[in-house]
Amino acid sequence: NKSADEFIVNSKTNGQLKVNVSGDLLLLDFPKDTLRNNSMHKEILEVLGVLPIELYEGRDDILAILDNEALVKTLKPDFSLLKNINKRGLIVSAEGSDCDFVSRCFFPSTGVDEDPVTGSAHTTLTPYWSNKLGKKKLHAKQLSERGGVLYCEEKNSRVIIGGKAVKYMQGNIYL
């Protein structure tokens, strides 16, 4: 029973995504998101109860940058107000104390108030923090209740996102 070092996942929104196995990490290869300034400061202040220091809009989500990790960790967003924002969700981030950056991701319009670890959000976060910190390889933490650690790398028009995974199912498909 040989394990594959590389395989392809077909995604409805991102096309074919290449997955590489490197040691105990799974590395996913995503298209990089492009950020534009967003002017919804008042609406995001109402949702979060804190004013972001920077606010952007990506392909699917709004990215709010906060002053520090403690603010990100202690947020209690108003999910009913967040549902009214015309995007999939809200990514909140700050520079990390023991990593490059931290984040939390809220998607109540999809039925998920807070996603525990969000690979797709890091296609938005990685270009922002890579530019801000002046480095291509980044170490990130998502501060949801379950939490997670991600390894991110900006590579031209792509973002490589890696993390550890636990096998929860095994089987065979017969065609």
Language model regions located:
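Active-site proximal loop and beta-alpha junction motif in alpha/beta enzyme cores
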Residues: N1-L175
